[in-house]
A protein has these predicted regions:
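Solvent-exposed, non-transmembrane regions of integral membrane proteins
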Residues: 1-253
Length: 253
């Protein structure tokens, strides 16, 4: 299933997102009842903007998240049912934005827009960005250089640069397990940089190198490519800003 979703990586995922939301925008603009496809679109739109659609979207999403949390089935997020749920929720939120982002007089409802657009951006970044997410592991001994790493299913993948482990050190606790460790690495023979636990090195936009583990033989690095995470962060900040304004000034605008 993982290989299937990678087919939709950039730029195809971005194109599909534009087509999906563009299609719903067309349905919104053609919402007056008419003949043929316009009548079908109008009826579909009425349902998607109904309380039943909103409640069902929230209930299904919460139920899916509870299932993942209690079952530990992380593979469920890559299944067609979960993808359909997220797409359904995004569509409902998008249509709510189209309907309510302005007052009848034309003034923008900034608190409403920040909250709903932030939610849509956070959900959308996680959804449409999944095909571009790559996680790899790379074991290196001191002084060793590699331009390839291993995906989580064991395939060899090119990094696009040379990673060299210049030096590493670790401190152990009383039972002999590492309590702190760090490594110095260089990328394409550039100046060495230090990587510690939970403090990765950002080698490119949306690509970070983490220090996963160390041993006497060397270090294991985790390379994570997640370019859409910044859009998710912007969405979360928008959501928080809207919630803060709502708390300070109330729901009036």
């Amino acid at each position: 299933m993982e290989h299937f979703w990678t087919f939709f990586s950039f730029p195809l995922n971005l194109l599909l997102a534009v087509l999906w939301f563009g299609g719903w925008t067309w349905i919104w603009k053609s919402r007056p009842a008419g003949d043929g496809m316009k009548l079908v679109a109008s009826r579909l739109l009425r349902f998607m903007l109904s309380p039943a659609a909103t409640v069902s979207a929230l209930v299904i999403l919460v139920a899916a998240c509870i299932w993942i949390g209690f079952s530990g089935d992380r593979e469920f997020v890559q299944t067609v049912p979960f993808v359909a749920v997220l797409l359904y929720v995004q569509t409902v939120v998008f249509l709510v934005i189209l309907r309510g982002w302005r007052h009848s007089g034309g003034a923008v409802r900034w608190r409403f827009l920040l909250i709903h657009a932030g939610l849509l951006l956070a959900l959308g970044a996680g959804f449409w960005g999944v095909p571009d997410y790559v996680e790899m592991r790379l074991p290196l001994a001191e002084g060793q250089t590699s331009e390839k790493a291993y995906t989580m299913d064991g395939r060899v993948a090119a990094l696009g640069y040379e990673l060299t482990l210049e030096d590493f050190s670790m401190e152990t606790c009383d039972v002999g397990k590492p309590s702190y460790y760090e490594a110095k690495v260089s990328v394409d023979d550039d100046e060495a940089v230090k990587i510690t636990v939970n403090h990765p090195y950002s080698v490119h936009f949306g690509e970070d190198i983490y220090l996963a583990s160390v041993s006497d033989a060397g270090c294991v690095f985790q390379i994570v490519k997640e370019p859409w995470k910044y859009f998710a962060l912007v969405g979360i900040l928008m959501l928080l800003a809207g919630a803060f304004l709502l708390f300070i000034k109330g729901p009036g605008k």
